[in-house]
Amino acid sequence: MKILLIHCHYRLPGGEDAVFAAERALLEQHGHTVVVYERSNEEAAHGAAKALLPFRAVWNRRAARDVRNIMEQQHIDAVHIHNTLLLLSPAVVRAAKKCGVPVVLTLHNFRLFCPNGILLRDGRVCEDCPHHGLHCALRHRCYRGSRAQTLVVVAAYWLHRVLGTWRGIAITTPTEFDREKLLEFNKIHPTFDENRLVVKPNPVTVPTGPVTLWEERKRQFVFAGRLEELKGLRTVIEAWRILGRDAPLLLVAGDGPLADWAKAQNLPKVQFVGQLPRDALHRLMAESRAVVAAS
């Protein structure tokens, strides 16, 4: 098959980008021809593009036109869409639907019903928007702490809910928990076809090569991921502060909004290695005692 993959990268690399890359590789390994349409929110970080972003996040005509042209010229058999926020907009979903081929959308979060996507606010579970409406996010500035930016996200998802953008397509989500929550929210605010929502776990790349025995590994732990509250980095740093000189070496791989705070703690047993390529990260994990997962 010839498959079109569509994805908008965030300004900071994250898990969605990794899944997108892994699925692309998996499809190609199994003999499919993969055509990629990808953009990055970094493109709209400055100048006129930044000024136009609030409008394009709701409906990006150019992106929709690009998708239609690719599908017509490349004779695409199926479309798999990942993230559309902010630069692509859900308009690319509508464009793909109009071309008459199967369309699959992977939901990596709960953004159809929750503007910040994670059902958390101030460190606690929050389901105000799924139960009472997207407008609740405006009161709490749920997207990046900005009422203006939250308004853009609310407008985009409200409009495309009304237009039925997510109906008539297959939707995948990585876990059964996600599926159950999405079905619960969809009964309150009908947004997609419930019978077309399925669980598709994220692919896992299994490292190959020699295995280092545990007793031969270095006395170090690895924290890998976006450096933000959601991933539990603050908790990990505080734990290493308490352990003090008795702590093993902690290698922090990644970048994000908490990077400056974490580095400012100046803990002797914590080192920051930045954003690593997947192979380098796997090698680092292979020679370490354990991986810290705190989210």
Labelled PLM ranges:
Residues 5, 68-88, 102-106, 111:
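Short N-terminal targeting/anchoring amphipathic segment
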Residues 1-40, 72-74, 92-102, 241:
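N-terminal subdomain of nucleotide-sugar transferases
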Residues 224-225, 233-271, 279-280:
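A conserved nucleotide-sugar
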Residues 78, 96-143, 172, 198:
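Active-site proximal beta-strand in glycosyltransferases
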Residues 286-295:
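Acidic donor-binding loop of glycosyltransferase active sites
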Residues 112, 131-209, 272:
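Donor nucleotide-sugar binding/catalytic pocket of nucleotide-sugar-dependent glycosyltransferases
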Residues 172, 199, 204, 208, ...:
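Conserved donor-binding/catalytic core segment of Leloir-type glycosyltransferases
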Residues 39-69, 81-83, 140-152:
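A short, charged, and often flexible helix/loop element on the N-terminal side
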